[in-house]
Swiss-Prot record:
Keyword Hydrolase: yes
Record keyword Protein transport present: no
Keywords: Cytoplasm, Endonuclease, Hydrolase, Metal-binding, Nuclease, Ribosome biogenesis, rRNA processing, Zinc
Enzyme Commission number(s) of this protein: 3.1.-.-
Gene source species: Burkholderia cenocepacia (strain HI2424)
The protein's name: Endoribonuclease YbeY
Length: 172
């Protein structure tokens, strides 16, 4: 789910006259109060998070990834989506910087992600990679809840990016 905070959707087509530029990722990683040292040991580290997010970027980005527990996840989901349960990932997309840099926060609820990975028989790393790619796409304006066409476009991007990272299709 994406929460747009004054954000406009990112353009989806490249202008052939634009000069290619190196994309930059300014990444911060945070841990909520409920995340114990034992849980932190199971989470992807900053370098790996960046490796998973970078292929999903179509513009430079300033992103914060925050790992939270069930209470914070529920509070955020209730406060912003009016749903009284924790969800796997929330994306807060903000207005882009003047130079076009995407700015956003990705909040992952560890207990939900762990339960989903277990229930779906997926490696935990594969599920975190999928949700980070999913959240990064949301931060750039992609939204699977607006139409079937948008959902198909976003899903295809996720599958392609994850395949390049060596992960199987998360929807199969």
């Amino acid at each position: 789910m994406t929460l747009h905070v004054g954000a406009e959707f990112a353009p989806r087509e490249d202008d052939p006259e634009d000069e290619p530029r190196a994309l930059e990722l300014d990444l911060s990683v945070q841990y909520g109060d409920e995340i114990t040292s034992d849980v932190r040991k199971t989470l992807p580290k900053r370098k790996l998070i960046a490796e998973w997010i970078e292929p999903a970027l179509f513009a430079s980005a300033q992103l914060t990834v925050r790992f939270v527990g069930e209470n914070e996840g529920r509070t955020l989901n209730a406060g912003y989506r009016h749903k009284d349960y924790p969800t796997n990932v929330l994306t807060f997309a903000y207005d882009a910087a003047p130079d076009g840099t995407v700015i956003g926060d990705l909040v992952l609820c560890c207990p939900v992600v762990e339960k989903e990975a277990h229930d779906q028989g997926k490696p935990l790393a594969a599920h975190y990679a999928h949700l980070l790619v999913h959240g990064a796409l949301h931060a750039q304006g992609y939204d699977h809840e607006t139409s079937d066409e948008d959902a198909a476009e976003m899903e295809a991007l996720e599958v392609d990016i994850l395949a390049k990272l060596g992960f199987p299709n998360p929807y199969q």
